[in-house]
Each structure stands twice: as C-alpha cells, then as structure tokens.
UniProtKB/Swiss-Prot annotation:
Similarity comment text for this entry: Belongs to the NhaA Na(+)/H(+) (TC 2.A.33) antiporter family.
Record GO biological process: regulation of pH
Compartment(s) of residence: Cell inner membrane
Membrane topology qualifier: Multi-pass membrane protein
Taxonomic source organism: Campylobacter hominis (strain ATCC BAA-381 / DSM 21671 / CCUG 45161 / LMG 19568 / NCTC 13146 / CH001A)
Task performed by this protein: Na(+)/H(+) antiporter that extrudes sodium in exchange for external protons.
GO molecular function: sodium:proton antiporter activity
Lineage: Bacteria, Pseudomonadati, Campylobacterota, Epsilonproteobacteria, Campylobacterales
Keywords recorded for this protein, A-Z: Antiport, Cell inner membrane, Cell membrane, Ion transport, Membrane, Sodium, Sodium transport, Transmembrane, Transmembrane helix, Transport
Name of the protein described by the UniProt record: Na(+)/H(+) antiporter NhaA 2
Gene Ontology CC entries for this record: plasma membrane
Ranges that cross the membrane: 14-34, 58-78, 93-113, 124-144, 153-173, 181-201, 204-224, 254-274, 291-311, 327-347, 355-375
InterPro entries hit by this protein: Na/H_antiporter_dom_sf, NhaA
Reaction catalysed by this enzyme: Na(+)(in) + 2 H(+)(out) = Na(+)(out) + 2 H(+)(in)
Length: 412
C-alpha cells in the first residue's frame, strides 16, 4: 500500500507540473512572448556524423526524441507488469482490458461518425482514445478516502492498457511512406539487442548505443520513431544478471526524468494555442466537435458500459469497496486526454494549423470538463462503500475485542 501511495503521489506531482507547463505555454503564445515562443519552437539543431545528419526544430526533437524515451519507459512498465506484475493474472487484468477496449472503440467511432466525409480530418480518430494518467491520478488524490484504493489500482492498470493501445495505434496507423533500407537497418538494431541478451551483457552503455541506432533507423524508416522506444524496452533484461536487475535500475533512473522533465516539456511545446477568434469559431468544426464528443462522452461511457456489461455477465467483478456511480466518475477521468491527446494530434495532423488550433483547444476544453465532471461525481458519490476500508478495519477491531471479552469471561 505504501508503494501505491508513493506512485500515486509521484504521478500527481507530474500532473501538477504538466498543468503549470500548459498554462505557461498559453501565456507565452497569447501575450507579449508570442514571437519568442514560436521562434523558440522552430530553432533548429541536430546531430552530424560524417555525411549523415539529422536537423530538426526543437518541437520535433521533443515529439520524436523525448517522447521515444517516454514510450521506452512505458514499455519497461508494460513488460514488468505482464511478466511478474498485475497483468500476469488473467483474473486481475480482465476488467481493465475490457474497459480499455471500450475506451478506445466508442470514442473512435464517435469521432469518425462526425468526420466521416473528410479524409484529412479522419486522421484524428485516435486523438480521443488516449488518457493522461498523471492528471487523472491527481484528481483521485484530491478526493482522498472518498475513492477506495481498489479503484485507484484499477485506474493504474487501465492506464497501462491505454498505453499499449496508444503504442499499437501509433505503430500501425500513423506511419508515413516506408523506407526498406531503414527498416532493414532497424532489423539489424533488433538483432544487436538479441545478441546482447544472449550474451547476458549487463552494461547499460551497450543498450544505449543499440537503442540510439534503432531510434535513428525508425526515424528514417517512416514508422514513427517513438515505436523504437517500445521495441528497445522489450529487450531490457528483467532477470538479474550477476545480481543486477537492469530493468528495475533503468526504470528507477528514468522515473523522475519522465515525470518532472519530459512530460512538462512536451506540454510546454505543444500546448501553446493561440486563443483568438479563429480558434474559438473553429470549435464548431467537425474535428473539434468529434474531439469533444470523443473525450467527454465516448471515452467515459466506453469504459463504463463495456465494464458494466462484463460485470453484469459475471466475466469480472467490480473493484472492492466501489460502486457503479464511482466507476462512472472514474470513466470521466479517463476522458482527460491532455498531453497524450496533444501528442496523437501532433502526429495525426503533422502539426498543421489547418484547424486554426481549434483541435488542440477542443482537447483542453474537453479534458477540463471531463476532469470536473469526474471529480464532481466521485466527490458526491457518498455511498455505503465510501469508507469501506475504515469499516472493515473497525469490524476487525470489534471482532478482536469480542474475542478478548470471551477469554476474560472464561477465565472468570
């Protein structure tokens, strides 16, 4: 339980930093720092190795580079959970998987229904299928004991399923024209990882070199470079070699870096939306409507309805000490797309300003409303199970007291 509390607090702190970074980006874009902010995002830098060079603006170094590290971290979590964690038990994973599927299918269908006639707009169908776990966890912590621990654990498991879906979506649906040579080089990179595992190498530097080579190969291949992070993570050894567990060590070292640096930086460079008349007038564009409907209705009710049906058909059970009203509130928290939706938006529309930033504005509006509604439902859920753990503890104490009284009576 202490480990869970630490993780939740860690995630919540990251959520606060993302909020601050988002507010700073909005201030920079809409006040006297507009020119500086836009110039900063487009400053080019790169890596030159002989005749080969990679030159990119800062915003793309963040979206293609730092986010690859983020997905690498996600991959480490997924690998550990699948092999020895909560996802290794079919019984425990059933409800998050079913809820996660609903949280992807329903919002995607809603978005496509609104944007069916526009081929370019349809590229954004996945924007509403992801969640920002840091924000959601932050809301849960604000509610304290009103939300049972079992529901918090469910949210974290659902977040892992959500991340897996995001990886699959990016890998299969957001690839540009493929380069056979670069894909071949990526294959060599994977082969290097295999050799490192076969030889049981436990030096991080070798894996960093192999990962960098793999990232460059993916970058040039047409497959989004963040997938290189996921692929590399699957080759980080979980089994200790000479008493050293590389996966745990790397995951521990990256945790703070991801939470306190990468995600806030990502929010800062991507959330700078021009809050002008064009952005607000374009909120009636089908893309904006699809995003709002997907995050505010599709995501929450997708998670809730799929889970509700599974529970009613006894395929799985409701998290201990919770009820369906709380579960609906949790569903709304999954509608907080925020940074993850902004990420999918950036690769779906290739940072195009065709919608005058109304797409990004819709993400922020829908995320805020989903957070408020979810918080409100959970806050007012006042149910019999609200203090489940306290009641259970009290019952145990009373039972113990009764046993002591019985012993005393027998002595007398």
């Amino acid at each position: 339980m202490q480990k869970l509390k630490f993780y939740l607090n860690h995630e919540a702190s990251g959520g606060i930093l993302i909020i601050i970074a988002t507010i700073l980006a909005l201030i920079c874009q809409n006040m006297i720092l507009t020119d500086f902010y836009n110039h900063f995002l487009r400053i080019e830098s790169g890596i030159i190795f002989g005749e080969y060079k990679i030159i990119k603006p800062i915003i793309l170094w963040v979206n293609d580079g730092l986010m690859a590290v983020f997905f690498f971290f996600i991959g480490l979590e997924v690998k550990k959970e699948i092999l020895i964690g909560e996802l290794s038990s079919p019984k425990k994973v059933a409800l998050p998987v079913i809820g996660g599927i609903g949280g992807v299918v329903i919002p995607a269908l809603l978005f496509l229904a609104v944007n069916f006639g526009d081929e370019f707009a349809r590229r954004g169908w996945a924007i509403t299928t992801v969640s920002d776990t840091a924000f959601a966890v932050g809301i849960l912590l604000l509610l304290g004991s009103k939300v049972p621990s079992s529901l918090k654990i469910f949210l974290l498991l659902l977040a892992i399923i959500d991340d897996i879906c995001a990886v699959v979506i990016v890998a299969f649906f957001y690839t540009s024209e493929l380069s056979n040579f670069a894909i071949f080089m990526a294959g060599i990179g994977i082969l290097i990882f295999l050799v490192l595992n076969i030889l049981k190498v436990n030096k991080i530097s070798f894996f960093i070199a192999a990962g960098s080579f793999l990232w460059v190969s993916f970058l040039e291949s047409g497959i989004h470079s963040t997938i290189a992070g996921i692929v590399a993570s699957f080759f980080i050894p979980l089994k200790p070699i000479k008493g050293y567990c590389m996966l745990d060590d790397v995951k521990h070292k990256l945790e703070g870096f991801i939470t306190y640096l990468i995600m806030p930086i990502f929010a800062f460079v991507n959330a700078g939306i021009a809050l002008n008349s064009d952005a607000f007038s374009n909120l009636l564009h089908p893309v904006s409507i699809g995003i709002i409907l997907g995050l505010l209705i599709g995501k929450p009710f997708g998670v809730f309805i799929f889970s509700y049906v599974a529970i009613k058909f006894k395929l799985c059970s409701l998290p201990t000490g919770s009820n369906f009203k709380q579960f609906l509130g949790l569903g709304f928290l999954t509608g907080i797309g925020a940074s993850m939706s902004l990420f999918i938006d950036s690769i779906a529309f290739m940072d195009s300003d065709q919608f005058a930033y109304a797409d990004k504005l819709a993400i922020l509006i829908a995320s805020f409303l989903a957070a408020f509604i979810g918080w409100r439902i959970l806050k007012t859920s006042g149910n019999k199970n609200e203090n489940f753990e306290t009641i259970k503890e009290a019952e145990t104490t009373n039972s113990t007291a009764e046993k002591i009284e019985d012993i005393d009576e027998n002595k007398n």
